[in-house]
Swiss-Prot record:
Primary location class: membrane
Taxonomic lineage of the native organism: Eukaryota, Amoebozoa, Evosea, Eumycetozoa, Dictyostelia
Protein name: Uncharacterized transmembrane protein DDB_G0284989
Membrane topology (UniProt): Single-pass membrane protein
GO cellular component: membrane
Keyword entries, A-Z: Membrane, Transmembrane, Transmembrane helix
Source species, domain of life: Eukaryota
Listed transmembrane segments: 12-34
Subcellular location: Membrane
Length: 71
């Protein structure tokens, strides 16, 4: 299952595609988002609501960084 997310920051928009896997790990989810924020140099807030849902029965794995649009 693929999910598209669009995050807005003060430097522009970050669009990415995620694939969900039946693995439970909220810590892994948090690590993925914080790593993405560092790699993209965008101050992205970790989507805790997504991570909390993911911790129930899904893990989020970044498979494709579609685009980074800067202002």
């Amino acid at each position: 299952m693929y999910k598209d997310y669009l995050f807005k920051s003060n430097k522009g928009y970050l669009s990415l595609t995620l694939v969900t896997l039946p693995v439970c790990s909220s810590l892994h989810c948090y690590f993925l988002w914080t790593t993405l924020s560092r790699l993209s140099s965008l101050p992205i807030d970790v989507p805790r609501s997504v991570c909390s849902v993911a911790s129930l029965d899904l893990d989020l794995v970044i498979i494709n960084l579609l685009s980074i649009l800067r202002d």
